[in-house]
Amino acid sequence: MLRYALIFFIIAIIAAVLGFGGIAAGAAEIAKILFYIFVVIFLVTLVLGVARR
């Protein structure tokens, strides 16, 4: 589960770089939203993974 959160976090980072860099100006807002959603998912999964140990 932590692996999937990390994969989605990396995808969100790539989308954010493309969106914030002006390459896809129309998609910048979507990239921002996805970035924050996946940061939250990553942190929740990280906490759950540490709590299970």
Swiss-Prot record:
Topological category with respect to the lipid bilayer: Multi-pass membrane protein
GO CC, alphabetical: plasma membrane
Localization annotation: Cell membrane
Highest taxon of the lineage: Bacteria
Pfam families for the chain: DUF1328
Family: Belongs to the UPF0391 family.
Name this protein carries in UniProt: UPF0391 membrane protein BURPS668_A3117
Organism (species): Burkholderia pseudomallei (strain 668)
